[in-house]
Curated annotation (Swiss-Prot):
Entries under PANTHER family matching the protein: 60S RIBOSOMAL PROTEIN L32 AND DNA-DIRECTED RNA POLYMERASE II, SUBUNIT N (PTHR23413), RIBOSOMAL PROTEIN L32 (PTHR23413:SF1)
UniProt-listed InterPro entries: Ribosomal_eL32 (IPR001515), Ribosomal_eL32_CS (IPR018263), Ribosomal_eL32_sf (IPR036351)
Name of the encoding gene: rpl32
Pfam families: Ribosomal_L32e
Function statement: Component of the large ribosomal subunit. The ribosome is a large ribonucleoprotein complex responsible for the synthesis of proteins in the cell.
Location relative to the cell: Cytoplasm
Lineage summary: Eukaryota, Metazoa, Chordata, Craniata, Vertebrata
Protein name in the entry: Large ribosomal subunit protein eL32
GO cellular component: cytosolic large ribosomal subunit
Species this protein is from: Ictalurus punctatus
Quaternary structure, from the entry: Component of the large ribosomal subunit.
Origin: domain of life: Eukaryota
Any Gene Ontology biological process: translation
Keywords from the named record: Cytoplasm, Ribonucleoprotein, Ribosomal protein
């Protein structure tokens, strides 16, 4: 079977690829880099002074058409069983399945086989599958 491709694959443009880092995280080791909104009354970052760190805001949002889109052009849909997989039957050109982390390896095999029959792309088909020589 040929590789499954999305119906359309628009160019995904990110307005910012750098991470937003927390104010003064470069100055103190105890302050982690993970973003926290500054809430102090005299804070320069919150006030938006020139030359300060940038704060995440609505303007950095993605295009509606490409939001949550994977580089392959599909959007992810989390699947726990075969019944949930069959929901994607009509929209297999725009959505791909991702098997949930808590699905057993026995059920994973069934889901992957059914996805191949329905021509649905699975992002993690080889996860938790043992090779034949180990058995």
């Amino acid at each position: 079977m040929a590789a499954l491709r999305p119906l359309t694959k628009p160019k995904i443009v990110k307005k910012r690829t750098k991470k937003f880092i927390r104010h003064q995280s470069d100055r103190y080791v105890k302050i982690r880099r993970n973003w926290r909104k500054p809430r102090g009354i005299d804070n320069r970052v919150r006030s938006g002074f020139k030359g300060q760190m940038l704060m995440p805001n609505i303007g950095y949002g993605s295009n509606k058409k490409t939001k949550h889109m994977l580089p392959s052009g599909f959007k992810k849909f989390l699947v726990h069983n075969v019944k949930e997989l069959e929901v994607l039957l009509m929209s297999n050109k725009s959505y791909c399945a991702e098997i949930a982390h808590n699905v057993s390896s026995k059920n994973r095999k069934v889901i992957v086989e059914r996805a191949a029959q329905l021509a649905i792309k699975v992002t993690n088909p080889n996860a938790r599958l043992r090779s034949e020589e180990n058995e």
